[in-house]
Each structure stands twice: as C-alpha cells, then as structure tokens.
Amino acid sequence: KVLSQNLNKDQKKDFCITHFFNPVRYMGLLEIVKNEDNDLNKINQLKEFCEVELGKGAIVCNDTPGFLGNRVGVYAMQIAMTEAFKMKLSVEEADAIFGRPMGIPKTGVFGLYDLIGIDLMADVLKSFIKELPKSDEFHEVAKEIPLVKKLIETGYTGRKGKGGFYRMKKTDSGKIMEAINLETGEYSTSQKIDIKSDKVDLKALINRNDKYGDYAWSVLSKIIKYASSLVPGITKEFNDIDEAMRLGFNWAK
C-alpha cells in the first residue's frame, strides 16, 4: 500500500511486489504480494513465469506485515525462544528439539538467531510490533528479553559479532564451542544433547513424557494455532503456509 499509494488505479492493476528469500541462489521461496486492484490473470502469468523460467516456488499472498513466510517463521522462532526461557531449557536442548526431530534445520532457534544476527532480529520484531494490530498474538512473543538486550548492548550479536547464544573460544589446545546459560548469562562448553533425533519422529517426540516432549508440543501447537489464524487474511490456502515454510525456512515437516 505504501509503495503504490501515489499510483493511479490503472497503474495499480499492474503493480505487485516480488519478495525473494535470501540467499536467492539457494532458497526456493518467492512471494508475490498482490493488491486488491491487481488483474488476477496478470498475477497468474507472473507466477507461471517465476516458476517456469526462474525455477522458484512462487506463492501469492496478500499485502500484510511480513507477508507469509516471515510472519510465520519469525513467530515460530520467537515462540521457540520464549518457551525455552519459560521451561528453563538450555540453548542446546532447545536447538536439539526445535531442529531435525521437528523437520527443521539443525541450527534450531538459537543457532538460527546467531546466523541471522540478534540485533537484526530485534529490528524485525520492532517492525512487526509497529505494524501489527494490538490484538495479534505476535505481540505476546515479541516482548523484550533482558538477556537478549544485554547481548546486543555488549556486541554479542551472533556470528558476525563476538558471539551470541553460541561463541567460539580460543584455548591453548584450539577452539571450543561455548553456549550461554539462559538464566545466568554465563558461557560454558557446549554440550551435545542426544535425543536420538534420527530415530524420533514428530509424533513420538510430542508424546514424550518429559520436558522435551512438553517443549516440543507447546511450541508446535502454538505455531499451528497462530498459522491457522492467518487464513484467510494472508492467504486463502493452508497449503500455502506449508509451502512457504518448506521453501523459505527449509522445514521438511
């Protein structure tokens, strides 16, 4: 709406947004953001071109904050983070669960935060808070976390900074990976969490009678609930959400 506000009605018919996910060379998702004045035949032609000629997975969505992929993806990251704090999990435990066992890349949530940039994620959250209505559940997971604020203030912004939730420490015997304690803010040697992810399917994971099962179900159920609430506001098809997460965030399930 902002980009097209000075266009006349005929111009608006031919105006839409194409949002490529980074890195463009590797990520398959391309969001085509339409407006209420668009000629749908032209939108469909553009979609076909993007799929056939560019080899992208093109999804048509409405003009809403974050479009489709980031709206769900950022919410998922935030709920995974806030639940880890709430349930007193370690960053390694959270990433071991909110990772391959759930069909999500092994970076999990805290590893992904470090990869994107903790400071950049803070800016993304501010944008969502500003643009989304107060009734949107996103506000509940976008509240400032003191430890995250401290990391940014001290230059621990992720891989591009001095470290983040994880950091590499140089020792006489070489480099070791350390992880931050979410309660104390202190770093210690990162621990490998073995939940036999190669043998645990999603159903078995959420049915576990332990903190890992509780965490997995709490996160998954909230993501599904939130994603479902976005239909038909962002898209008319539930399958579009699945495709956006598969192509834009490499979710396999």
Regions found by a protein language model. Give the residues of each.
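N-terminal glycine-rich phosphate-binding loop for ADP-containing cofactors
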Residues: 1-253
